[in-house]
From Swiss-Prot:
Organism: Saccharomyces cerevisiae (strain ATCC 204508 / S288c)
Keyword Cytoplasm part of the UniProt annotation: yes
Family: Belongs to the eukaryotic ribosomal protein eS8 family.
Leftover remarks: Present with 15900 molecules/cell in log phase SD medium.
Listed name of the protein: Small ribosomal subunit protein eS8A
PROSITE patterns for the chain: RIBOSOMAL_S8E
Taxonomic path: Eukaryota, Fungi, Dikarya, Ascomycota, Saccharomycotina
Pfam families, A to Z: Ribosomal_S8e (PF01201)
Length: 200
């Protein structure tokens, strides 16, 4: 029996079983879930209706994640799934889907922040090795102008100290073959942090 996306097999609103007046059709087909896992990139192409293609990511380990408040995006490594709104089983098996909350490597974002604002992020304040490197006057002027906007919220800064950021996947790895998303901030981050602590 193939997977079908029709609704003719469902009971009616009154609970009556519908009569089968036709067989399954090709345009109603469904496919098995991709169940994308974290690992070395493995992507299969699937021929779909109209000769189009879908890209089924079976294994993927990196993605482009955007930092909305700073207006940048960086390619970074995905560490693991920590929360899923629909199913705890997907957390246990580290399955990547849209809307999954994952932890990503903070290094590319930390390096960008330090280059852009000239301030260390997620490190102890008493470390002084970097101050020996001479910076140009032009760089100093740029950093001085940007200093006012170099504030980030404390809950995000504490994640930089740990080297892992919470992010939400916004692409569909089983359809597009990509695992892209955005870093959680503000009320959304607070909501998911509450969910994570409640789960423990």
């Amino acid at each position: 029996m193939g997977i079908s996306r029709d609704s003719r097999h469902k009971r009616s609103a009154t609970g009556a079983k519908r009569a089968q007046f036709r067989k399954k059709r090709k345009f109603e087909l469904g496919r098995q879930p991709a169940n994308t896992k974290i690992g070395a990139k493995r992507i299969h192409s699937v021929r779909t209706r109209g000769g189009n293609k879908k890209y089924r990511a079976l294994r993927i380990e990196t993605g482009n994640f955007s930092w909305a408040s700073e207006g940048i995006s960086k390619k970074t490594r995905i560490a693991g799934v920590v929360y899923h709104p629909s199913n705890n089983e997907l957390v246990r098996t580290n399955t990547l889907t849209k809307a999954a909350i994952v932890q990503i490597d903070a290094t590319p974002f930390r390096q960008w922040f330090e280059a852009h604002y000239g301030q260390t992020l997620g490190k102890k304040k008493n470390v002084k090795e970097e101050e020996t490197v001479a910076k140009s006057k032009n760089a100093e002027r740029k950093w001085a102008a940007r200093a006012a906007s170099a504030k980030i919220e404390s809950s995000v800064e504490s994640q930089f100290s740990a080297g892992r950021l919470y992010a939400c996947i916004s692409s569909r790895p089983g359809q597009s073959g990509r695992c892209d998303g955005y870093i959680l901030e503000g009320e959304e981050l607070a909501f998911y942090l509450r969910r994570l602590t409640a789960k423990k």
